[in-house]
Curated annotation (Swiss-Prot):
Catalyzes the formation of a hydroxyacyl-CoA by addition of water on enoyl-CoA. Also exhibits 3-hydroxyacyl-CoA epimerase and 3-hydroxyacyl-CoA dehydrogenase activities. This is Fatty acid oxidation complex subunit alpha. NCBIfam families: FadJ, PRK11154.1. It comes from Shigella flexneri serotype 5b (strain 8401). Residues 306-714 are annotated as: 3-hydroxyacyl-CoA dehydrogenase. Keywords: Cytoplasm, Fatty acid metabolism, Isomerase, Lipid degradation, Lipid metabolism, Lyase, Multifunctional enzyme, NAD, Oxidoreductase. One of its GO terms (biological process) is fatty acid beta-oxidation. HAMAP family: FadJ (MF_01617).
Length: 714
């Protein structure tokens, strides 16, 4: 049976050809290799019709133009040559579109990303809608790749090399107004007149490319170009620490095209695409993409979720304010905040105001839309307005009696169906539900700070939580724009449990004489966004270390922190960035202020700060303990799968994405090699490095956690 076409040609009475893109049975349009013949057949018809005045590409999907190429095509390539051939096929198709003798216009509404933007770049003009759903970008770098269908060559010539490099190197997505300002699109119109605006543009002569800004013209010359690439290269190296080969290849390919012409540029682009597709970094990044897509489809349980019409929040502090923001402004649900203090409510409202006002200032949001979203949030010092809330999120202090009291109050003041979700980071959910009248409706919902930025949430059912409560909480998390993983109700849950030994080891190395900045730099070089000591300062030393005694009580001395170090630091009133002094000292300008290591920290903890270990040795000690604990979490079924374990570590603590998560990293090293490293470290530094039984068994049998495919487990 012949596959239904994703591209349909209709010629209007005014001799404008409309090519409608609608991939059958898919919510998103993605480009697949088999579509090439369909597009070529249409191009042939266009060339044969001498009456045609212009062509318009438009999508039939309600919220996307083309979301990119189908990534599975890359996974199917076994060699760099096969992936290179795929890129050349894409380049050739775009060249044929571009070579049409009549104006070709892309009418863009919704996501226009990757191969979708490359198709739009091959057109002679572009019109997009002013809808917030409309975004344009080349995100291939986030998969360890570069644009392979001409994007590295066409974009710099259209908008200038420095602006194009920023887009391609970061995967940054532009909204309609930004795209118009940069010259990426020729017009921005309301959705209702998109087709007519594109048709009018197609009836004119080919749109002439507008002149580049003076700065971009200077940077396009040999001298300006040399300076630009040197500067951008240094900045990129600092940011990636050399861990992402795609960024180096992007610079090389763009420069080749500008210096030697487009023919050489296209050659370099296809070759680099093929080689990058085979790198372990790209394979790991693609595995994270597939795993996160998979998690987003996971309902959490077999039961249908209950309706979600409104949410209540207990506590207007930093977490409560952040949760209110994502619930109202991302999920679009009415939120009522209860705090014993009116100032707490004001704080939470200001939190959302600050977030939304920032978007208005950056022109990402209209003031009217800001006001509409803010109107969803209200506050109270009692339980008025809570009677019919479907789900209550508790974000009060980490105190068991207080949380149990909150459960009792919610059961007394809310509906019989209301779910109680605790944002605890350390207390067992079973204990919080111990005196509940409806324990099946009590669950953990652990957000990470800052709530609006951190993509992960942990959902923690206790033994008595119902399947419907799990499904409803998962549904809410997804509405809030989060990636949820369901974890077992054991001390530390998953993320904090694997993070604690990593941070403990960093503190232990401090007491042995390693310097703060050396430890942090070693882990940043390894691939973490910040080092462990800085992370502790950012989270708050008091907050970050609160869980250590809980974990030590549950799992024994492998979780013990170096004696008296934490208490010495806290007794010296060091809480980290929030009070201006921790391991680092901070200026007065809030989060943007510069930090420097406080030399007084060394005598305070009885250390010299001399340092004897190399950066790889420092990283090895921290990371191996994290890997070992992650394997224990699989063994104890704290996480439901290694997929969730990899996603949890990458999205929850910034485990290096190019390594694919703890379990993919173990697979890449080999379980046997990880065991050998840990046994060596155990001999040198003590029994906390003893590899767990599961790891030893896997090493002996030569087993791995993942199969070779992107999402299947062994």
């Amino acid at each position: 049976m012949e596959m239904a076409s994703a591209f349909t040609l209709n010629v209007r009475l005014d001799n404008i050809a409309i090519i409608t893109i609608d991939v059958p049975d898919e919510k998103m349009n993605t480009l697949k290799a088999e579509f090439a013949s369909q597009v070529r057949a249409i191009i042939k018809q266009l060339r044969e019709n001498k009456e045609l005045r212009g062509v318009v590409f438009i999508s039939a999907k309600p919220d996307n133009f083309i979301a990119g190429a189908d990534i599975n095509m890359i996974g199917n390539c076994k060699t760099a040559q096969e992936a290179e051939a795929l890129a050349r096929q894409g380049q050739q198709l775009m060249a044929e579109i571009n070579a049409l003798p009549i104006p070709v216009i892309a009418a863009i509404h919704g996501a226009c990303l990757g191969g979708g933007l490359e198709l739009a770049l091959a057109c002679h003009g572009r019109v997009c809608t002013d809808d917030p759903k409309t975004v344009l970008g080349l995100p291939e770098v986030q998969l360890g790749l570069l644009p392979g269908s001409g994007g590295t060559q066409r974009l710099p010539r259209l908008i200038g090399v420095s602006t194009a490099l920023e887009m391609i190197l970061t995967g940054k997505q532009l909204r309609a107004k930004q795209a118009l300002k940069l010259g990426l699109v020729d017009d921005v119109v309301p959705h209702s007149i998109l087709l007519e605006a594109a048709v009018e543009l197609a009836k004119k002569d080919r749109p002439s490319s507008r002149p580049l800004p003076v700065r971009e013209r200077i940077l396009a010359g040999p001298l300006g170009r040399a300076l630009l690439f040197k500067m951008v290269g240094k900045k990129t190296e600092h940011k990636t620490q050399g861990n992402y080969p795609a960024t180096e290849r992007i610079l090389e390919v763009v420069e080749t095209g500008l210096a030697q012409g487009t023919s050489s540029g296209y050659d370099a682009e296809a070759r680099a695409f093929g080689e990058l597709a085979m790198t372990p970094q790209s394979q790991a990044l693609r595995s994270i993409f597939f795993a996160s897509t998979d998690v987003k489809k996971d309902p959490g349980s077999d039961a249908p979720p209950a309706p979600l019409n409104s949410v209540g929040i207990l506590g207007g502090g930093l977490m409560g304010g952040g949760i209110a923001y994502v619930t109202a402004c991302k999920a679009g649900l009415p939120v009522r905040i209860k705090d014993i203090n009116p100032q707490g409510i004001n704080h939470a409202l200001k939190y959302s105001w600050d977030q939304l006002e920032g978007k208005v200032r950056r022109r990402h949001l209209k003031a009217s839309e800001r006001d509409k979203q803010l109107a969803l949030i209200s506050g109270t010092t009692d339980y008025r307005g809570f009677a019919h809330r479907d789900l209550i999120i508790e974000a009060v202090f980490e105190n068991l009696e207080l949380k149990q009291q909150m459960v009792a109050e919610v059961e007394q003041n809310c509906a019989a169906h209301t779910i109680f979700a605790s944002n605890t980071s350390s207390l067992p959910i079973g204990d919080i539900a111990a005196h509940a009248a409806r324990p099946e409706q009590v669950i953990g919902l652990h957000f990470f700070s800052p709530v609006e930025k951190m993509p992960l949430v942990e959902i923690i059912p206790h033994a008595g939580t119902s399947a419907q409560t799990i499904a409803t909480t998962v549904k809410l998390a997804k509405k809030q724009g989060k990636t949820p993983i369901v974890v077992r109700d054991k001390a530390g849950f998953y993320v904090n449990r694997i993070l604690a030994p990593y941070i403990n080891e960093a503190i232990r190395m401090l007491t042995e004489g390693e310097r703060v900045e050396h430890i942090d730099a070693a882990l940043v070089k390894f691939g973490f966004p910040v080092g462990p000591i800085q992370l502790l300062d950012e989270v708050g030393i008091d907050t970050g270390t609160k869980i250590i005694p809980v974990l030590e009580a549950a799992y024994g001395e492998r979780f013990s922190a170096p004696a008296n170090v934490v208490s010495s630091i806290l007794n010296d009133d060091r809480k980290g960035r929030k009070n201006g002094r921790g391991f680092y000292l901070y200026g007065q300008k809030g989060r943007k202020s510069k930090k420097q290591v406080d030399p007084a920290i060394y005598p305070l903890i009885g250390a010299q700060g001399q340092g004897r270990l190399s950066a790889p040795q420092v990283a090895e000690r921290c990371v191996m303990l994290m890997l070992n604990e992650a394997v224990r979490c699989v063994d104890e079924q704290v996480i439901r799968s290694v997929r969730d374990g990899d996603i949890g570590a990458v999205f929850g603590i910034g485990f290096p994405p190019f390594l694919g998560g703890p379990f993919r990293y173990i697979d890449s090293l080999g379980a046997g090699e990880v065991v050998a490293i840990m046994q060596r470290l155990a001999t040198q530094y003590g029994s906390r490095f003893t590899p767990c039984e599961r790891l030893v068994e896997m090493g002996a049998r030569g087993e791995s956690f993942w199969k070779t495919t992107a999402t299947d487990l062994q």
